[in-house]
């Protein structure tokens, strides 16, 4: 007997329900024109990296726990004396999620992490870039269940960019609404 291949819940929902809803709403001429999620980029900038060079490594470990994938340590491109930053100094971490990990992260973000954000009133519907990509920020990384609150010595914020194949912001907004993104009214 062949093993059933694992498929994330949101990907299954996209194939079965969301594609049909998008086709009805925008009436695309071709099935390949229906927008889909391309990738999710999570960036964690560590401002305290100038004082302690171990901070980006700790942030990268937390980001690896959240994303389920090893992040890349980002380095300064050039020196800025005002910020006490030298060229090639580690200043943060980032990770790009695609495929099954992307859908799993999106599921945890929308259903678990965002409701745990303090004073959360919804995502800003104007945070689209004009080409169908959505960017948001989270001030505390402890809203994710993968982070043990007792072991955290410092809280970091993170930028989350959801890249879609949509050509306009309206298409991307409709796609993300179908994925249950809680946009502000």
Curated annotation (Swiss-Prot):
Family stated for the protein in its record: Belongs to the universal ribosomal protein uL5 family.
Gene3D superfamilies: 3.30.1440.10
Subunit text: Part of the 50S ribosomal subunit; part of the 5S rRNA/L5/L18/L25 subcomplex. Contacts the 5S rRNA and the P site tRNA. Forms a bridge to the 30S subunit in the 70S ribosome.
An example Gene Ontology CC term for this record: ribosome
Function: This is one of the proteins that bind and probably mediate the attachment of the 5S RNA into the large ribosomal subunit, where it forms part of the central protuberance. In the 70S ribosome it contacts protein S13 of the 30S subunit (bridge B1b), connecting the 2 subunits; this bridge is implicated in subunit movement. Contacts the P site tRNA; the 5S rRNA and some of its associated proteins might help stabilize positioning of ribosome-bound tRNAs.
Protein name (Swiss-Prot/TrEMBL): Large ribosomal subunit protein uL5
GO molecular function annotations of the record: rRNA binding; structural constituent of ribosome; tRNA binding
InterPro entries membership: Ribosomal_uL5, Ribosomal_uL5_bac-type, Ribosomal_uL5_C, Ribosomal_uL5_CS, Ribosomal_uL5_dom_sf, Ribosomal_uL5_N
Keywords: Ribonucleoprotein, Ribosomal protein, RNA-binding, rRNA-binding, tRNA-binding
One protein family per Pfam: Ribosomal_L5
GO biological processes: translation
């Amino acid at each position: 007997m062949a093993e059933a291949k694992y498929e994330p819940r949101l990907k299954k929902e996209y194939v079965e329900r969301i594609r049909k809803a998008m086709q009805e709403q925008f009436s695309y001429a071709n099935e390949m024109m229906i927008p889909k999620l391309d990738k999710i980029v999570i960036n964690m900038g560590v401002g305290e990296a100038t004082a302690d060079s171990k901070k980006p490594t700790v942030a990268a470990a937390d980001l690896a726990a959240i994303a389920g994938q090893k992040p890349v340590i980002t380095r300064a491109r050039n020196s800025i004396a005002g910020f006490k930053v030298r060229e090639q100094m580690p200043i943060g971490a980032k990770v790009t999620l695609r495929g099954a990990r992307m859908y799993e992260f999106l599921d945890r973000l929308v259903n678990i992490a965002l409701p745990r954000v303090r004073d959360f009133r919804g995502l800003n519907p104007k945070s689209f870039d004009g080409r169908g990509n959505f960017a948001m920020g989270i001030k505390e990384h402890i809203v994710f269940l993968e982070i043990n609150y007792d072991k955290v010595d410092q809280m970091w914020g993170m930028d989350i960019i959801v890249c879609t194949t949509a050509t306009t912001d309206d298409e991307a907004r409709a796609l993300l609404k179908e994925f249950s993104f809680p946009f502000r009214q």
